[in-house]
Amino acid sequence: MYTPEAIGTPLTPSSLKVLLLGASELGRELAIALQRLGIEVHAADRYAGAPAHLVANKAHVLDIHDEDAIRQLVREVGPHFVIPDSETIPAEVLQEIETNEVASVVPTALANRLTMNREGIRTFAHDKLGLPNSTFRFASTADELARAAEEIGYPCVVKPVMSSSGAGQSYVGGVDELEAAWNAALKHSRTNAQRVMVEQYIPFDYEVTILAVRSIDPATGREATWFCEPIGHRQDRGDYVESWQPAHMSEDALDTARSIAARIATALGGRGVYGVELFVKGDDVYFSEVSPRLHDTGMVTLGTQRFSEFDLHARAILGLPIDTTLISPGASAVIRCEDKHDGDIEYAGVNKAMAVEETNIYLFGKPRALARRRMGVAVATAENIDQARQRAEEAAGYIEVRPTVFAEGGQ
């Protein structure tokens, strides 16, 4: 992986360039972090005005699933680093970019390929690394799903092989619920492939995300892994709605969680932030998934850490020193649009939200309001997690996403 000896000046021949393939809200915060370090940021997405477009040095609109379009953009931009901001970027073109040394793919082309879907990463984690996980099978038809569920036993969980966050997941208590689970998985699949994963249901106590950060250790000159404090989170219908840090874990469970995170991040290689999702039951920890990029639950680090996950990702990509110090307990709560709105939108209640003690609001600037779409996040700190969660939830609740109300004489 390329390690720059110096950082040039953006928009000049000396510039150090990064290309984001995908321009989400996570990419937006990463772009800001990179720009603070003097990096020239290019952001590409399928629609104009995506969150990272609004802050990048240059914005590009193209089909980020089109291999030829990506190749052409890479030729035009000439980036030093290509950072996929989505699991749906074609693996073949990323491998081509890395193999031909056109640019460094973050963290690696292998990591992006294996984590494109649950089948690739779960098989790798189980067969190659021997990580503890629930029993699982894959199915391409409803009949295969029925046989797999029978082998694993009920209750079980059915998931699309490829979906966004937890979309399309179903708890299946018996055979009579399989058809609905199959249909839900196909409906929310990120591809047209009719393939699902069915896994043993573990009555876990809680879920955590471990952010594992891989960069160069200045003491040794070699790549090493650092860990942020564990992040707890809650989902609603598969979507992240709140997170908090630090999540309470026993010492044994935390040691195991960090060991699992280190093993998967090291095996996938490269530099950057890995978001490792784990189930915890007592002191037992089970691998669930890994994201070779920024993690939505990690938005809480905007308030809790000396350097947020975005700062850490930027530093790690460049091979710079890492500091994962926690400075305060904190929590985040998602600001969602409950209903679809056509046309321009605005955010009411910002004054009330920011009057909540130790709280900040981040609005993503998305151009369209869709039902249940994540439009921003409230981040709060406090002396303890319970208080921080209350503050974040209160602040998020004050924000109303609504059609723009023009004042008389306004434009």
Curated annotation (Swiss-Prot):
Pfam families: ATP-grasp (PF02222), PurT_C (PF21244), RS_preATP-grasp-like (PF22660). GO terms for cellular component: cytosol. This is Formate-dependent phosphoribosylglycinamide formyltransferase. Involved in the de novo purine biosynthesis. Catalyzes the transfer of formate to 5-phospho-ribosyl-glycinamide (GAR), producing 5-phospho-ribosyl-N-formylglycinamide (FGAR). Formate is provided by PurU via hydrolysis of 10-formyl-tetrahydrofolate. Residues 123-318 form the ATP-grasp domain. Its EC number is 6.3.1.21. Pathway: Purine metabolism; IMP biosynthesis via de novo pathway; N(2)-formyl-N(1)-(5-phospho-D-ribosyl)glycinamide from N(1)-(5-phospho-D-ribosyl)glycinamide (formate route): step 1/1. It comes from Corynebacterium jeikeium (strain K411). It catalyses: N(1)-(5-phospho-beta-D-ribosyl)glycinamide + formate + ATP = N(2)-formyl-N(1)-(5-phospho-beta-D-ribosyl)glycinamide + ADP + phosphate + H(+).
